[in-house]
Amino acid sequence: MTRTAIPLAIFLGLAGLFWYVLQQMNQGEYNPRSVPTQFIGRSAPEFALPDLLDPDRIVRTSDMAGQVWLLNVWGTWCPECWKEHEYLIHLATREQVPIIGINWRDDAAEAKAMLARLGNPFARIGFDPKSDAVIDWGVYGAPETFLIDAEGIVREKHTGALNPQVWQSKFKPYFDAAAGSS
């Protein structure tokens, strides 16, 4: 009896843990890809990248000074980036959220084709094919989205596709507070 009871107890314990983690993931409360960032509460790292759509222009962190905004790191090679794109369009057009994109490790022609096909949610897009800027932000995958407040401080980070649940819980309160104070 003991020979089967111990393995059964271990199996049931692991099954329960697995079920709990799945429930947390489905509710958006646990993201196994989420890695803490050292930038929360610190000044946003400065970058200067050529604009994807107009390479003669430079996109800088300082372009957004005085505003609450999102920085979204994306690439056409990233399935989750395609998944979140429609929601980014919603945020930019319906919620009037300023979003700066960094197109990372990508082919400019493919990125432009994606935007032409699906729409462009970005106020500006820095082109970073060699990781010149994203390394300073601690980016290790895409998509990653950062919220920067009006003082230029990084307040939130999300790894993975942005969706309504993440928007409501992590990012929207900052935009609501900024709208209330203006």
Where are the model-predicted features located?
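Aromatic-flanked redox-active Cys/Sec active sites in thiol-based oxidoreductases
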Residues: 72-78, 104
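Hydrophobic beta-strand anchors of alpha/beta hydrolase catalytic cores
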Residues: 70-71, 99
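Short gly/ser/thr-rich secondary-structure transition/capping motifs
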Residues: 28-31, 50-56, 125-128
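Thiol/disulfide oxidoreductase modules built on the thioredoxin-like
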Residues: 4, 116-121, 128-182
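Short loop/turn microsegments at loop-to-beta-strand junctions
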Residues: 45, 69, 142-144
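A short beta-strand-turn-helix
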Residues: 47-70
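N-terminal targeting signals for export/organelle localization
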Residues: 1-50, 182
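Structural microenvironment flanking redox-active thiols in thiol-disulfide oxidoreductases
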Residues: 82-119, 128-135
